[in-house]
Amino acid sequence: MTVRVAINGFGRIGRNVVRALYESGRRAEITVVAINELADAAGMAHLLKYDTSHGRFAWEVRQERDQLFVGDDAIRVLHERSLQSLPWRELGVDVVLDCTGVYGSREHGEAHIAAGAKKVLFSHPGSNDLDTTVVYGVNQDQLRAEHRIVSNASCTTNCIIPVIKLLDDAYGIESGTVTTIHSAMHDQQVIDAYHPDLRRTRAASQSIIPVDTKLAAGITRFFPQFNDRFEAIAVRVPTINVTAIDLSVTVKKPVKANEVNLLLQKAAQGAFHGIVDYTELPLVSVDFNHDPHSAIVDGTQTRVSGAHLIKTLVWCDNEWGFANRMLDTTLAMATVAFR
């Protein structure tokens, strides 16, 4: 069957989900029937077609009245502020992809359900009372038909959780720290301007800016045994896409750097193929732009100190990789629900 999807919020992730759907050739599996976005339809069409990070969209895009066309596919455009007023029942929506970055509570999910959607997938970490949180490649097999309101976690969680799992399974992690080196985001300023976070009052293109992160909480959500044993910090850097994560863990078993790399390389070629990639090429962040993997391990940066402290660098395209995981999780939800 083809999963009928509606997208709520047509920003960076919402637009990349549509592009990833068409570029990955999954239109027989997923069809987008509607997009709800407060911006005007002409602007939606323009930004879908022309993207500073990902270049021109190869498909023809046009807008006619209340419809957006990608090739010959018509997508209804809505501008509803109230979730309860969305016509999901009328449109026969199977899964709503809520890509607003604003909504994430069970109450918001239930509003989509009340409007007629069968399932809801948030494109960001949700509240603890959601049915489950998925990091595709790690725990999607735990999805059940009764899971209606689901979170796809965050781009950084999707990046680091598979690597942590691999290291923990092999060597037994005792504790760890994570530093996220993240490209600038829409909640920063082009030039100095007011913001509740005084660091984010400063021009994004001119500084490396420390910001708060809940990544440590995201890690312990998947690995409760690491509660109070993982910490995370984050900085934003003056690039517009791609993120690097510096992961340091202490492990129980003694290990060498080449053994760590061999473990991660084998995983990329085997059980985590398509989710984790591995490289030893002398690459920089722009080289990972438009990479569909959740995580790309940079084997040239792996270090081991004292046989028990592992440091490694993991890259991800925080937009494109995550958009592809949204599609993967959507299909996984539909498979268990509608089989």
Curated annotation (Swiss-Prot):
CDD domains: GAPDH_C_E4PDH, GAPDH_N_E4PDH
CC per GO annotation: cytoplasm
Stretches assigned to coiled coil: none
Enzyme class: oxidoreductase
Family matches, as InterPro entries: E4P_DH_bac, GlycerAld/Erythrose_P_DH, GlycerAld_3-P_DH_AS, GlycerAld_3-P_DH_cat, GlycerAld_3-P_DH_NAD(P)-bd, NAD(P)-bd_dom_sf
Residue spans crossing the bilayer: none
Residues annotated as site: Activates thiol group during catalysis: H182
Active site, per annotation: C155 (nucleophile)
Subcellular location: Cytoplasm
Gene Ontology molecular functions: erythrose-4-phosphate dehydrogenase activity; NAD binding
Pathway entry: Cofactor biosynthesis; pyridoxine 5'-phosphate biosynthesis; pyridoxine 5'-phosphate from D-erythrose 4-phosphate: step 1/5
Gene Ontology biological-process entries: pyridoxal phosphate biosynthetic process; pyridoxine biosynthetic process
Annotated NAD(+) binding sites: R12, I13, R81, N318
SMART domains: Gp_dh_N (SM00846)
Catalytic reaction equation(s): D-erythrose 4-phosphate + NAD(+) + H2O = 4-phospho-D-erythronate + NADH + 2 H(+)
Protein family (similarity comment): Belongs to the glyceraldehyde-3-phosphate dehydrogenase family. Epd subfamily.
Function: Catalyzes the NAD-dependent conversion of D-erythrose 4-phosphate to 4-phosphoerythronate.
Designated name of the protein: D-erythrose-4-phosphate dehydrogenase
Organism the protein comes from: Escherichia coli (strain UTI89 / UPEC)
Gene name per UniProt: epd
